[in-house]
Amino acid sequence: MSKKISGGSVVEMQGDEMTRIIWELIKEKLIFPYVELDLHSYDLGIENRDATNDQVTKDAAEAIKKHNVGVKCATITPDEKRVEEFKLKQMWKSPNGTIRNILGGTVFREAIICKNIPRLVSGWVKPIIIGRHAYGDQYRATDFVVPGPGKVEITYTPSDGTQKVTYLVHNFEEGGGVAMGMYNQDKSIEDFAHSSFQMALSKGWPLYLSTKNTILKKYDGRFKDIFQEIYDKQYKSQFEAQKIWYEHRLIDDMVAQAMKSEGGFIWACKNYDGDVQSDSVAQGYGSLGMMTSVLVCPDGKTVEAEAAHGTVTRHYRMYQKGQETSTNPIASIFAWTRGLAHRAKLDNNKELAFFANALEEVSIETIEAGFMTKDLAACIKGLPNVQRSDYLNTFEFMDKLGENLKIKLAQAKL
């Protein structure tokens, strides 16, 4: 390459522990030698979040709103042990949750597939992208133990002072039990629908929404009706032009269909279903280290990409002691490529789009050529059978990727 590609504005968020080390290596070896970015950096490391009373996380989210593209390194969400370890002022909330609450949108998880990494579900040759509606339902419910006989009722009191409406949930006649009231909001469901339709158009894959509307006729029926109405009014012609489709499916039918499919579709899930199915699907593809996570906002313009895994604390402890590590950087690399690909799409920047695609191809081709980290070697051979010659350490693997990227870009004569 004779000159660097002009990349435009990107918000990058640094993270914690081993992924922070890898994040710097990705920039140094794979991004900065080839792409000139207008980079807006925010340090979301746990110490800086504590020093700024978590203001840095909010600032980063506002910057993503402004520039439309964010790439995020994995971060620590502190528990009691972490509060003690870092002497934190308080147990700060998950940065992902804070950013999601500010931006809105839906998180889509997608597997990165290599031919030589075995999958538990061998028929899945293309990714299944799960979009989880991470709002409401059981996660914002009010639940309680019913101590003894009596009625549980739900009452709706209109703000305009008109008559209340009361529904009987259950009449407990013989002893107590448990009860729960949960909700969702039309606006949130509409945003979920728009994000899902935008994602399907962006990938060129069909979209399925799963509910249990045969049982929850009003509750799940609302999800089904809102999706259908938005699809018919705003997206149907675009879907037909791309020869893709949208369908509603019952959750049990959808689970069965997903297992026997070859993949290659978007699956929009309600909150609980998405929580369960995203982990189930991730395991089916073989490795969480090979899973991307992209937050897509309802406008289709604003995107934040990150790895779907944590900060790899165990490897970081080894690294601190000067011991060798073999940490998989692929999901973090794909956070960058998905962010850059979206920047390229917004700016109609063909060179940047080519670069993002080339880096993804190099990552997969390198693994398929037999150069990989220890976790992937373990997927192929089983951990007890892995020898040192089967894998590269963290830094060797990054060097190998850098070497292969250089060759690919030189051949492309960009």
From Swiss-Prot:
One of its GO terms (cellular component) is cytoplasm. NADP(+) binds at residues 75-77, 82, 260, 310-315, 328. Its main location: cytoplasm. It is an enzyme of class 1 (oxidoreductase). InterPro entries: IsoCit/isopropylmalate_DH_CS (IPR019818), Isocitrate_DH_NADP (IPR004790), IsoPropMal-DH-like_dom (IPR024084). It catalyses: D-threo-isocitrate + NADP(+) = 2-oxoglutarate + CO2 + NADPH. The modification N-acetylserine is found at residue 2. The modification Phosphotyrosine is found at residue 42. NCBIfam families: nadp_idh_euk, PRK08299.1. This is Isocitrate dehydrogenase [NADP] cytoplasmic. It comes from Homo sapiens (Human).
